[in-house]
Regions:
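C-terminal structured subdomain/cap of oxidoreductase catalytic cores
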Residues: 89, 104-107
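Residues within well-ordered alpha-helical secondary structure of globular protein domains
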Residues: 25, 48, 102, 112-116
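Residue-level structural signal for beta-strand termini and adjacent loop
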Residues: 79, 99-101
């Protein structure tokens, strides 16, 4: 709390995967290079020097999936259906206009990145990182 200015607000997307790297940073512990971390330290965000997330966020729970990268979010309510939606969160924060049809290449790149992320998470869950 002594390092965070009262009333600080941010539009940077964060997630629970950021907790561990943030705690490590706050207590001054460095992770070995051979141990991947999915999240980022939020300390620069608290200190006002982080204006955008340096890496995308992936989600996969109960058959739903999302990939958040910068202003864009790809979302699929049923992963097995492969019916992804695409939103520009800066222009459309309430996700009313699905841009999948007119930004197909952008959507394909994001879905491919999500698939690689998911494979990495599954490998890690089986002990692949350790």
């Amino acid at each position: 709390p002594a390092r965070i200015k009262s009333g600080t607000r941010s539009e940077v997307a964060t997630c629970t995967v950021d907790y561990f790297p943030t705690i490590l940073d706050l207590v001054g512990i460095e992770m070995p290079d051979d141990r991947p971390l999915d999240g980022i330290s939020l300390v620069p965000l608290f200190e006002g020097s982080l204006e955008s997330r340096p890496s995308p966020l992936g989600f996969h729970i109960r058959g739903q999936a999302a990939w958040h990268d910068g202003d864009w979010k790809a979302y699929c309510s049923k992963v097995n259906s492969h019916e992804w939606e695409l939103y520009n969160l800066k222009d459309d924060p309430h996700e009313k206009k699905n841009r999948a049809a007119d930004k197909l290449l952008k959507l394909e790149v994001m879905v491919e990145a999500w698939e690689k992320w998911k494979a990495s998470v599954e490998a890690s869950d089986k002990g692949g990182d350790y």
